[in-house]
């Protein structure tokens, strides 16, 4: 009997404690919901395109498109009607623009980005980059050596593959080399453009994509990585690093960047390309340039490059890497950019003064040419 009374007492005490914990001394007040934020650490932003010193579009994963009109102090989210990843965006003027992305996604706006219409790209391949020299003419690149072009603002597309064909007896072995992924395009007008991608591919056209020429051959004598015991000499020119981004300021001057932190440059339209020196900081001694040598410590991949303002340039990459073009043609780590431990996917300047850097959970804005940067919280 005593044991039952003790058990009853314990149960009663527990109920009292639960009641007190639930009710407390005051009436419970409903907490307001947390505000919805346009920028979170889980966001993956892939590209940015400014249309004025303070107005810019930013695109990313899960169909996310943001617009700021006040230099990143506030953002408006634009519903584009898809959850597909958006990898690239370009506005050709204040009203007209295009974006591209996952599963053949191509969309167009004609009202300044308020609404977006999906275009029939006739492909389900990923489209990683685009370049529109004007509102009607554009070029898009992607998986399996895909290049698409339009001359009517996306009403129709011409598709082709920039592939290298090998003899039938080695076609199975050569399959990964025949259709490399193309990541980036840069056109300075409707005729002259460049495309870069996997395995060091560089292609150029001077007639609006009617024909293309490979340009990476000038890099091969500079590349000092020897063939391995199982490497086939017929694939020697595929040992170059993958290039993720290319930027041309005119028909002569361009740069590209990619794996292992390499930057290449040309001042003759790509007839010759050269690997660029790098430095730990502005004014520091340059590295010993041995392209292809194993880097210790390893250098971060570079995902984007932008030539702007006549003679300036920046490049961004993994774990917050930011390089700045120096007067001597070398690239140095830029200490003015806040340390960010996340990938920085894209740098883009509107002019020599106003620019943006976007990446994973990160949007940065400068209005003094990159001397200082401001985090945009949205």
Model regions and ranges:
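Bacterial N-terminal signal peptides that target proteins for export
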Residues: 2-14
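Bacterial N-terminal signal peptides
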Residues: 12-22
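Residue-level hotspots at or immediately adjacent to binding/recognition sites across diverse folds
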Residues: 25-378
């Amino acid at each position: 009997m005593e044991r039952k009374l003790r058990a009853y007492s314990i149960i009663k005490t527990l109920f009292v404690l639960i009641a007190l914990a639930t009710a407390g001394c005051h009436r419970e007040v409903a907490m307001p919901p947390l505000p919805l934020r346009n920028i979170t650490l889980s966001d993956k932003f892939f590209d940015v395109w400014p249309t004025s010193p303070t107005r810019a579009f930013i695109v990313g994963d899960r169909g996310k498109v943001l617009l700021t009109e006040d230099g990143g102090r506030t953002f408006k989210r634009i519903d584009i009607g898809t959850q597909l990843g958006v990898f690239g965006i370009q506005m050709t003027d204040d009203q007209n623009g295009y974006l591209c992305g996952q599963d053949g996604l191509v969309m167009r706006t004609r009202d300044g980005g308020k609404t977006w219409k999906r275009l029939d790209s006739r492909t389900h391949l990923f489209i990683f980059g685009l370049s529109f020299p004007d509102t009607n003419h554009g070029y898009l690149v992607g998986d399996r050596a895909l290049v698409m072009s339009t001359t009517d603002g996306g009403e129709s597309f011409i598709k082709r593959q920039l592939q290298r064909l090998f003899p039938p007896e080695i076609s199975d072995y050569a399959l990964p080399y025949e259709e490399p992924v193309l990541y980036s395009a840069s056109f300075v007008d409707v005729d002259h453009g460049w495309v870069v991608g996997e395995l060091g591919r560089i292609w150029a056209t001077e007639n609006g994509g009617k024909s293309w020429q490979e340009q990476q051959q000038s890099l091969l004598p500079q590349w000092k990585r020897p063939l391995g015991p199982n490497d086939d000499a017929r694939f020697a020119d595929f040992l170059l690093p993958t290039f993720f981004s290319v930027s041309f300021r005119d028909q002569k001057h361009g740069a590209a960047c990619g794996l292992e932190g390499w930057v290449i440059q040309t001042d003759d339209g790509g007839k010759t390309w050269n690997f660029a020196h790098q430095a730990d900081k502005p004014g520091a001694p340059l590295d010993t340039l041995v392209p292809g040598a194993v880097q210790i410590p390893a250098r971060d991949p570079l995902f984007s490059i932008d030539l702007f303002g006549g003679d300036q340039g920046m490049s961004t990459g993994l774990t917050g890497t930011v390089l700045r073009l120096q007067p001597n043609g070398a690239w140095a780590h830029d200490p003015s950019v806040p340390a960010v431990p996340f990938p920085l996917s894209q740098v883009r300047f509107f002019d020599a003064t106003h620019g943006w850097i976007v990446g994973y959970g990160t949007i940065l804005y400068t209005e003094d040419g990159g001397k200082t940067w401001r985090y945009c919280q949205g």
